[in-house]
Structures are given as structure tokens and as C-alpha cells.
């Protein structure tokens, strides 16, 4: 009797780890799709953006960016700041992703908070190829988000309901993300950096001009304090 291929064994091992992620990604993705559709975009916007960007927080923000006047510098800095934590994820995964061959570029591209957490902590069973395990965790997580965003975009055009105030979902999402990170962290290192920089720049530059200075301050602080932040990040997922 032939034994299972390493890829098939890896898929069967990876899938159970992604089931909790499906619950979150699918419904949040649907919310994003509906939000995009009610903001005036066709369903293929969230469908394509969920694959090309694959960053939930950035995709929500991108909706308002697409509706705002063209400001490439602010868009670039905003994107860098929102996704900056991935720099530390990437550094932490250098050894684990070593030797994964052609899969490595996709593993780097598809890394998100949940994928990082699973791939960093999972104990890969014997007989399952390590590279394929990481690949299927990443692929399944992205598929869940893609599926939710696409269905949300389609349903958002079919359903007729009062969407007034739906744009507040983005504000609520960032508040929930901040609170979740605050509760998970013991040191609140990065949270304090963000709070102090935001309040200081708001007072110095005013509500209309504080965003870019805040992002620059946070980026500089996180870069300068990379080693302690990276160490705390690794402790949080162990």
C-alpha cells in the first residue's frame, strides 16, 4: 500500500489549524466586501484586492483612500505603517522558511497575523512536509479571506438595507484590534509608542495634518527598538 505524499499529508495536517481562522476571516471578509460595495465599488474590487493586498486592515483603509483625492505619499506611508509589524514577523520566520524552495516567495507574500501565529507555533506531524504545511496554511487562510470578501461584494449589491453608519466598521475594527493587542501583550510596548506618538503629533500638528508625522514617528521608534519588540513578539506566540 502506497503511503500518502508529503503534500497530501501536509494539507491534512494544516487544515485543522486553519478552521478557527476561517470563522474570523470569512465573516470579516464579508463585512469588508459589503463595505466596499456600499461605498460605490463593484464586487470585483474587494475580490481582486483580497488577493493582491491580502491585508485586512489595509484593505479597509484602502476603501477611503480610493475615495479620497490622489495623495501617493500619504498612501505609501499609511500602507507601510499599517503593515509594519510584518517586518518583525518576517525576521522571526527566516529560519522556518529556509529551504522551502519555490514556495518561499508566496509564504512571504501571504504572511498575516494569523498565518504567522500558526506557522510559528505549530508542531508539524511526522510524514508531513514542512514547506507544504506552511504553504497550505498560508493558502487556506488567504482563500478564506478571498471567499468572504467576494461573497460580501456580491451580496452587498443584492441586499437592500439601510447602510448608514456602516463606514464606522473601520473605526470599530481598529479599536477592537488595538484592544485585542492590549489584552494579549503584557508589556504594551508598541501600543504605548503608537498612543504617545499619535497624541503628541495631534497636539503639535492639528487634526488635519498629524497623520503623516505620527506614522513617521512610529516607524522610526519601532525601527530603533526593533530587537526588544521582536523579542516580545516571539514571546507572545509561544
Predicted regions and their residues:
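Helical membrane-embedded segments and adjacent short helical loop/helix-boundary regions
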Residues: 11-28, 41-47, 52-55, 160, ...
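Pore-lining transmembrane helices
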Residues: 13-108, 122, 144
Amino acid at each position: 500500500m502506497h503511503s500518502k505524499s508529503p503534500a497530501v499529508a501536509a494539507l491534512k495536517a494544516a487544515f485543522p489549524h486553519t478552521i478557527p481562522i476561517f470563522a474570523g476571516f470569512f465573516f470579516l471578509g464579508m463585512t469588508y466586501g459589503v463595505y466596499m460595495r456600499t461605498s460605490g465599488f463593484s464586487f470585483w474590487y474587494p475580490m481582486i484586492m483580497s488577493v493582491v493586498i491580502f491585508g485586512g486592515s489595509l484593505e479597509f483603509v484602502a476603501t477611503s483612500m480610493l475615495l479620497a483625492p490622489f495623495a501617493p505619499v500619504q498612501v505609501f506611508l499609511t500602507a507601510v505603517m499599517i503593515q509594519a509589524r510584518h517586518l518583525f514577523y518576517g525576521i522571526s520566520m527566516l529560519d522556518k522558511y529556509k529551504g522551502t524552495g519555490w514556495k518561499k516567495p508566496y509564504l512571504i507574500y501571504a504572511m498575516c497575523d494569523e498565518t504567522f501565529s500558526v506557522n510559528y507555533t505549530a508542531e508539524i506531524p511526522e510524514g508531513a512536509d514542512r514547506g507544504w504545511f506552511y504553504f497550505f496554511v498560508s493558502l487556506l487562510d488567504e482563500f478564506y479571506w478571498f471567499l468572504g470578501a467576494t461573497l460580501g461584494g456580491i451580496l452587498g449589491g443584492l441586499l437592500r438595507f439601510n447602510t448608514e453608519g456602516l463606514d464606522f466598521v473601520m473605526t470599530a475594527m481598529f479599536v477592537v484590534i488595538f484592544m485585542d493587542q492590549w489584552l494579549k501583550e503584557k508589556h504594551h510596548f508598541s501600543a504605548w509608542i503608537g498612543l504617545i506618538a499619535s497624541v503628541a503629533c495631534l497636539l503639535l500638528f492639528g487634526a488635519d495634518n498629524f497623520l503623516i508625522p505620527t506614522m513617521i514617528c512610529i516607524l522610526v521608534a519601532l525601527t530603533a527598538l526593533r530587537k526588544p519588540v521582536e523579542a516580545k513578539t516571539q514571546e507572545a506566540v509561544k
